[in-house]
């Protein structure tokens, strides 16, 4: 009796296994690919797109190196680069549409694209800087005319005008900007390096706030102590009024004094199409 039951069980298991195999074969015949096949296709698509982006990045780097010595002959190369970037953007959209049903793969793809495009943007900024230095025949203008460009900001030096701190602040507001805020020692060095008059005095966006009894920039943030020398920091702690910039140093004066000023606003994004 037990032998009959064992034989029946084995026969049933074999028939179930055979049925499962038959079902899988039917699914394949109907056009449903195996999971491993789908993953291989997704991985291949990701790899292809990343390679294309890397090729564009390398092309951009080569163009930048060549521009240093051949700035006047780069308009055709920049046009070619613009076409490459547009093709990459089209490919990105097409690839993303294919992986909507694969969240993990889609997020990985987006992170890789974001990283590569960020590096392309950095190279585009360098190219724009070279264009501004070496030629006037270009469309790359992240700042208005008469403004200076540094990193992500534009600066306006009111050299031939003098106003009180409140009126200087208003003038900057009329230009959709603020009195300059110094965020780093590098920015401080940039301001000091500008070709300015022999005795330049420029208002900064730093003033004493009597209500909070502290020094504040126009965005209500407090200045970092690392921006000041020991002398500057001691002067600020002992004084009240408005801050001005002279020969690379920060001083304090009464806000009613009339001197020049510096406005600052965010620079426009550098676009590839602006480089031709």
UniProtKB/Swiss-Prot annotation:
<protein>
    <recommendedName>
        <fullName>C-type lectin domain family 12 member B</fullName>
    </recommendedName>
</protein>
<dbReference type="GO" id="GO:0019903">
    <property type="term" value="F:protein phosphatase binding"/>
</dbReference>
<feature type="glycosylation site" description="N-linked (GlcNAc...) asparagine">
    <location>
        <position position="91"/>
    </location>
</feature>
<feature type="transmembrane region" description="Helical; Signal-anchor for type II membrane protein">
    <location>
        <begin position="44"/>
        <end position="64"/>
    </location>
</feature>
<keyword id="KW-0735">Signal-anchor</keyword>
<dbReference type="GO" id="GO:0030246">
    <property type="term" value="F:carbohydrate binding"/>
</dbReference>
<feature type="disulfide bond">
    <location>
        <begin position="172"/>
        <end position="263"/>
    </location>
</feature>
<feature type="disulfide bond">
    <location>
        <begin position="242"/>
        <end position="255"/>
    </location>
</feature>
<dbReference type="Pfam" id="PF00059">
    <property type="entry name" value="Lectin_C"/>
</dbReference>
<keyword id="KW-1015">Disulfide bond</keyword>
<keyword id="KW-1003">Cell membrane</keyword>
<dbReference type="GO" id="GO:0030545">
    <property type="term" value="F:signaling receptor regulator activity"/>
</dbReference>
<feature type="topological domain" description="Cytoplasmic">
    <location>
        <begin position="1"/>
        <end position="43"/>
    </location>
</feature>
<dbReference type="GO" id="GO:0097325">
    <property type="term" value="P:melanocyte proliferation"/>
</dbReference>
<feature type="glycosylation site" description="N-linked (GlcNAc...) asparagine">
    <location>
        <position position="176"/>
    </location>
</feature>
<dbReference type="GO" id="GO:1904893">
    <property type="term" value="P:negative regulation of receptor signaling pathway via STAT"/>
</dbReference>
<dbReference type="GO" id="GO:0009897">
    <property type="term" value="C:external side of plasma membrane"/>
</dbReference>
<keyword id="KW-0675">Receptor</keyword>
<dbReference type="InterPro" id="IPR042916">
    <property type="entry name" value="CLEC12A/B"/>
</dbReference>
<feature type="glycosylation site" description="N-linked (GlcNAc...) asparagine">
    <location>
        <position position="237"/>
    </location>
</feature>
<dbReference type="GO" id="GO:0002769">
    <property type="term" value="P:natural killer cell inhibitory signaling pathway"/>
</dbReference>
<feature type="modified residue" description="Phosphotyrosine">
    <location>
        <position position="7"/>
    </location>
</feature>
<feature type="domain" description="C-type lectin">
    <location>
        <begin position="150"/>
        <end position="264"/>
    </location>
</feature>
<feature type="topological domain" description="Extracellular">
    <location>
        <begin position="65"/>
        <end position="276"/>
    </location>
</feature>
<keyword id="KW-1133">Transmembrane helix</keyword>
<dbReference type="InterPro" id="IPR033992">
    <property type="entry name" value="NKR-like_CTLD"/>
</dbReference>
<keyword id="KW-0472">Membrane</keyword>
<keyword id="KW-0812">Transmembrane</keyword>
<dbReference type="InterPro" id="IPR013600">
    <property type="entry name" value="Ly49_N"/>
</dbReference>
<dbReference type="InterPro" id="IPR016186">
    <property type="entry name" value="C-type_lectin-like/link_sf"/>
</dbReference>
<comment type="function">
    <text>Inhibitory receptor postulated to negatively regulate immune and non-immune functions. Upon phosphorylation, recruits SH2 domain-containing PTPN6 and PTPN11 phosphatases to its ITIM motif and antagonizes activation signals. Although it inhibits KLRK1/NKG2D-mediated signaling, it does not bind known ligands of KLRK1/NKG2D and therefore is not its inhibitory counterpart. May limit activation of myeloid cell subsets in response to infection or tissue inflammation. May protect target cells against natural killer cell-mediated lysis.</text>
</comment>
<comment type="subunit">
    <text>Homodimer. Interacts (via ITIM motif) with PTPN6. Interacts (via ITIM motif) with PTPN11; this interaction triggers dephosphorylation and activation of PTPN11.</text>
</comment>
<keyword id="KW-0597">Phosphoprotein</keyword>
<feature type="short sequence motif" description="ITIM motif">
    <location>
        <begin position="5"/>
        <end position="10"/>
    </location>
</feature>
<dbReference type="InterPro" id="IPR001304">
    <property type="entry name" value="C-type_lectin-like"/>
</dbReference>
<dbReference type="Pfam" id="PF08391">
    <property type="entry name" value="Ly49"/>
</dbReference>
<dbReference type="InterPro" id="IPR016187">
    <property type="entry name" value="CTDL_fold"/>
</dbReference>
<keyword id="KW-0325">Glycoprotein</keyword>
<keyword id="KW-0430">Lectin</keyword>
């Amino acid at each position: 009796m037990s032998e009959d039951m064992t034989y029946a069980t084995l026969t049933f298991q074999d028939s179930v296994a055979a049925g499962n195999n038959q079902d899988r074969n039917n699914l394949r015949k109907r056009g449903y690919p195996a999971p491993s096949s789908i993953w291989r296709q997704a991985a291949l698509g990701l790899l292809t797109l990343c390679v294309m982006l890397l090729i564009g990045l390398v092309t951009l780097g080569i163009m930048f190196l060549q521009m240093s010595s051949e700035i006047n002959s780069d308009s055709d190369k920049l046009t070619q680069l613009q076409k490459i970037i547009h093709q990459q953007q089209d490919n990105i959209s097409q690839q993303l549409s294919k992986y909507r049903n694969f969240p993990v793969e889609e997020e990985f793809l987006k992170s890789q694209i974001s990283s590569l495009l960020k590096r392309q943007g950095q190279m585009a900024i360098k190219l724009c800087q070279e264009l501004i230095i070496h030629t006037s025949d270009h469309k790359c203008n992240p700042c208005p005319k008469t403004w200076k460009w540094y990193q992500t900001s534009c600066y306006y030096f009111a050299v031939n005008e003098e106003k009180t701190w409140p009126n200087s602040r208003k003038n900057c507001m009329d230009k959709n900007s603020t009195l300059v805020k110094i965020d780093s020692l590098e920015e401080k060095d940039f301001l000091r390096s500008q070709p300015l008059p022999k005795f330049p005095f420029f208002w900064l966006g730093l003033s004493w706030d009597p209500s909070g009894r502290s020094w504040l920039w126009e965005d209500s943030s407090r200045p970092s102590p690392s921006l000041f020398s020991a002398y500057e920091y001691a002067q600020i702690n002992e004084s009240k009024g408005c801050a001005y910039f002279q020969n690379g140093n920060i001083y304090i004066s009464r806000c009613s004094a009339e001197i020049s000023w510096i406005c600052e606003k965010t620079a426009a994004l550098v676009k590839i199409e602006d480089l031709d």
